[in-house]
Every structure is written in C-alpha cells, then in structure tokens.
Amino acid sequence: MVEKKPAVRSQDPGQRRVLDRAARQRRINRQLEALENDNFQDDPHAGLPQLGKRLPQFDDDADTGKKKKKTRGDHFKLRFRKNFQALLEEQNLSASEGPNYLTACAGPPSRPQRPFCAVCGFPSPYTCVSCGARYCTVRCLGTHQETRCLKWTV
C-alpha cells in the first residue's frame, strides 16, 4: 500500500512564523507602498504619433445616445491634467490660512477600535499569532491560514 505524504501546511503549527509588532507594521507599510505604486498610470496618448490625426479615446463609457459637446473648459481640463503629486505640490506652494490636504485630520476616536474578523467581517475575539489579523471562529482561522496569512491580503 502506498503511504500518503502529509500536507506541508499541516505538519507542525509550531513552525509557523511569528512576527512581532514592529515587523507587522513594516510589512503593512511595505504592502501599502506597493499598492500606491501599483495603480500608477501614464498618459495613454504619450507614445502615439501626433501627425494631425485625431487620437483615439480611451474612455470606458459606452454611451450610445446623444454625445455631450465638449466646451473649451473641458478641453483645457483634459489637456492640462495634473496628477495627485503635482496638485499636492501646488497646494503647498500656495499660502492659505485654512486646513489643506496635509494638515486636515480628525481627532482621536473617543471609543476603542472594534475588532472585526478579517475573513467574514463578524466581531472577532481572537488574533492570529503569526500576522496579527483578527478571526472569529476556527473555520475562519483555517481559511485565513490557507489563503491569507502572511500574504498580501492581510
């Protein structure tokens, strides 16, 4: 009879990596930076030749009805569009008395943070030892360890 090999994941729960609070925070910051850099998009018209031809529109709108005529203001808004970093730098250079994007913030919460399960969203009394994510039941813990623990979707 052929012996079955045990699954690598279920060999020994003591072999799972345990991260301290600082390592968890570094991991979360690295994941957030990767998300910030992930969706960066350049101008889709940048590589196309401009020989007086009309450039294609890369809009996802599927309007088959009447088309709205673009006004001159819309033309300049589309042509001289700025990215988020350029808008922040412009706002920092202009002196304004009121709160801006960098100075506006909410005060600390008056109540403690409510812990919710990372898998199903219900209130969770337990925390994963390895990564610090919350879970509510053994079933959610199993799902978390199989699919999410120490991966990009904590």
Swiss-Prot record:
Residues of the region (Disordered) are: 1-73
The protein, known as: Zinc finger HIT domain-containing protein 1
Tell me the gene name.
Znhit1
Q: Where is the composition biased (Basic and acidic residues)?
A: 14-23
Summarize what gene deletion causes: Conditional knockout in hematopoietic stem cells abrogates deposition of histone variant H2az1/H2A.Z to lymphoid fate regulator genes and causes reduced bone marrow cellularity and a decreased number of common lymphoid progenitors but an increased number of common myeloid progenitors compared with wild-type mice. Conditional knockout in intestinal epithelium results in intestinal epithelium dysfunction after birth with dramatic body weight decrease leading to the death of 30% of mice after the first postnatal week while survivors show obvious growth retardation at P30.
Residues the record lists as binding Zn(2+) 1: C117, C120, C136, C140
Family per similarity comment: Belongs to the ZNHIT1 family.
Give residues annotated as binding Zn(2+) 2.
C128, C131, H144, C149
Single GO BP term: negative regulation of G0 to G1 transition
Q: Which SUPFAM superfamilies match?
A: HIT/MYND zinc finger-like
| This protein's record includes keyword Metal-binding | yes
Gene3D superfamilies, per this entry?
3.30.60.190
Protein function: Plays a role in chromatin remodeling by promoting the incorporation of histone variant H2AZ1/H2A.Z into the genome to regulate gene expression. Promotes SRCAP complex-mediated deposition of histone variant H2AZ1 to lymphoid fate regulator genes, enhancing lymphoid lineage commitment. Recruited to the promoter of the transcriptional activator MYOG at the early stages of muscle differentiation where it mediates binding of histone variant H2AZ1 to chromatin and induces muscle-specific gene expression.
For the region Interaction with NR1D2, give the residue spans: 72-110
| Start and end residues, zinc fingers (HIT-type) | 117-149
Would you say which domain of life the source belongs to? Eukaryota
Q: Which UniProt keywords apply?
A: Chromatin regulator, Coiled coil, Metal-binding, Nucleus, Phosphoprotein, Zinc, Zinc-finger
Question: Where would you say this protein principally sits, based on its record?
Answer: nucleus
Q: How is it modified after translation?
A: Phosphorylated on Thr by MAPK11 or MAPK14. Phosphorylation is required for MYOG induction, for deposition of histone H2AZ1 at the MYOG promoter and for SRCAP complex integrity.
- Any matching Pfam family: zf-HIT
Q: Where is this motif: Nuclear localization signal?
A: 38-47
Q: In which tissues is it expressed?
A: Higher expression in testis than in other tissues (at protein level). Expressed in the lens (at protein level). In the intestinal epithelium, expression is enriched at the bottom of crypts. In hematopoietic cells, enriched in hematopoietic stem cells and progenitors with significantly reduced expression in differentiated cells such as granulocytes, monocytes, T cells and B cells.
Q: Which residues form a coiled coil?
A: 23-39
> What is its subcellular localisation?
Nucleus
Supply the source organism for this entry: Mus musculus (Mouse)
